[in-house]
Amino acid sequence: MNATPANATTPVESKDIGFIGLGNMGGPMAANLVKAGHRVTGYDLLPEAVEAAAQTGVRPAASAAEAVAGAELVFTMLPTGRHVLGLYTDGGLLAAARPGTLFVDSSTIDVADARAAHDAARAAGHRALDAPVSGGVFGAEAATLTFMAGGEAAEFAQAEPVLTAMGRKIVHCGPAGSGQAAKICNNMILGISMIAISEAFVLGESLGLSQQALYDVASTSSGQCWALTVNCPVPGPVPASPANHDYRPGFAAPLMAKDLGLAANAIREGGVDAALGLRAAELYAAFAEGRGAGEDFSGIIRAIQERSGRDTSTADRSAGTPGGGAV
């Protein structure tokens, strides 16, 4: 495994890039490629997404095939493996690209689908990487994503200088599918962590502990983690967290449910004893189908509060120092 920090001071040769999927993640990623001096042609099924990307310098295409014609690299950021494979094959994306094009799929999909996409690209005379990301919309906008890449070393070496325009950390995880494997495992850690933190805040409140006091202890002790210090599920301690903005997503709960579903499938198929991963998948699936459909994944604390018979406003109501202190 090779890990490379992005270096914005290193000149990067300008590339012709096609970008398919210009939504909440793909749009900012394509914009950062333009900022880095690349020539980007983009397409999305939603005209408003294409129009928004055009405002950032992305050349709009009337079809996916038009977006990839003449491209040296093609990025895809799509909802599921079914969408990726369908676009590659039945959608004609591989056929429309010039021979030897490098396809980089940054969607979060099943490992088997990632390997199938890689094989389809190779069979059509192209090269491929699976390169999902971590960092959410904020990371996409700030060009601070982590890329987890799976594929051959030569393909990674070609893509790496381009990935640095969108990410802060670029990791070559191994052969095809390894990037998706890393993403699934990472988000299983994240989902379990958020549930544990949320349960701890609800338990602490029931014991008369203020949310700020628990944060002050856990954030400087062995309980410290990203889900606490960056995406804290209660309002007050971390002003930029979604909890302070009515749980408007950064990383939407349905996306966490999707990723944990992929992890649960892999757990079952691999015969792995991962009880917490399976339970986290169940909890997020239920949350995403209900009140969490439009919320950040940290909003799961309100589901835990409801099941515990607590007030779901999440304001710091418990004894001790009130919430709202500085980080």
Where are the language model's segments positioned?
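Helical "substrate-binding/catalytic lid" subdomain
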Residues: 179-279, 283-308
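Hydrophobic beta-strand scaffold residues
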Residues: 40, 60, 128-129, 170, ...
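Rossmann-fold NAD(P) dinucleotide-binding segment
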Residues: 64-127
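Rossmann-fold dinucleotide-binding core
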Residues: 17, 87-89, 109-187
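NAD(P)+-binding Rossmann beta1-loop-alpha1 motif at the extreme N-terminus of oxidoreductases
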Residues: 2-77, 96, 101, 106, ...
